[in-house]
Amino acid sequence: MMDRDSADQSSADSTPIEPPHSNAPSGPVVVSVCTTCKTADGSAVVGPEMFASVRAALGVGDANVVVRPVQCLSVCKRPATVAVTSPDGYTFLFGDLQTESGTAALASFVKSYLKSNYGLVPWRERAEVLRKGMVARVPPMRWSPDDGLAPK
């Protein structure tokens, strides 16, 4: 288990992270960064800066992670907004992210996401900025509606 200090730190190395077991998310983790987010008072667009920062932190060329710009995640009252998802994993939507602290937290979160069952990073292992900025956690598409338990 990762302690909180290591969960709040990130390393920008370019070594691909391999999922350790079959319940880890398959396919790439997709990090979608809203590029139309503005400051709360609407005076400045902060999305492009967040996108550039997240892309730099997570690296380019890692087949396990894709960072993409999106025009709107419809969480306009909580800029900057970022979604993290994978084909068979949970989707997380975070808001209220500042470029520096949010980027470091997201880099650490994505590494943990890749190693967690279905991308479900335990709450206590998430950086405080992500715990406070949580907008939504959506279960994987293969979620069982009959019993509500995690996919098997």
Predicted feature locations:
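Ferredoxin-type iron-sulfur electron-transfer modules in oxidoreductases and energy-metabolism complexes
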Residues: G47-V65, D96-S101, L106-F109
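Intrinsically disordered, low-complexity regulatory segments enriched in Ser/Thr/Pro
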Residues: T91-G95
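Local cysteine-cluster metal-coordination motifs and their immediate loop/turn environment
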Residues: V29-A44, P69-S86
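Polybasic, low-complexity association/targeting segments
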Residues: D3-C37, D146-K152
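Short, charged low-complexity linear segments at domain edges
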Residues: M2-E18, G42-G61
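Generic structural "secondary-structure junction" signal
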Residues: V75, D96-T99, K132
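Immediate flanking context of iron-sulfur cluster ligation sites
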Residues: P20-S32, F51, R55-V75
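Short flanking/linker segments adjacent to small metal-binding domains or redox-active Cys/His motifs
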Residues: R78, A83-G89, A107-K152
